[in-house]
Amino acid sequence: MPTPPVQPSRPIPPNPTPIYRIVHIDNLSTILARGNIHAPNHVPADGRAWTGIHDVTTQAARGQLPVPCGPRGVILDYVGFYFGPRSPMLYRIHTGHNVARVDQSNIAYLVSTVQAVAGAGLGFVFYDRHSLARVAACYDNLARLNEVDFQTCNATQWNTTPQFPDRQEKKQAEFLVHRAMPWSLVGQVGVVNAAAAARVNEILAGSVHRPSVSVEGSWYY
């Protein structure tokens, strides 16, 4: 019987495992007032201002997609994070491709870790690629983090090619926090330049919890 080919081993996931969410800087005041980043289906009816940067069509699909593990529900019951920066969604926002164009100086990254979420006892799931991808696999056990292609999640090139037909899907692997993500679990805010950092620091000046604010130009286009 022929020996099966040796499959390449998956890289060991980073520990701690960073997760990244992009938001409009104008929304930081609302997040601070609420003390949480809320999932779309669980936003308080408090009338506070919110500037959306999402794709309406994609958001509608996420509202219909059942989550097959963990706390269940649908994708919009969760706060979404990526496992790496420089997402295809940020590129679309930067270029205005089928979404409202927003200058990247107005976009901040909220950075936490998988371990912080799990340690706080929050419900979560994660996908090995974009959750809307036909073959996306859902997990709720951190022992399965090696199913995520972290090399692709952190790659600067993510376009689909004949050699890498699912690279764009894998770049968008998601970590989803059920219902709400406490502001206290955000450990870093990344921005594109010093002016944006000054703006964020001004907003955070009155916050009890003040994550570090850093200029991360390589996270942007």
Residue spans for each PLM region:
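Active-site-proximal loop/hinge segments that shape catalytic or ion-binding/gating pockets
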Residues: 1-82, 87-221
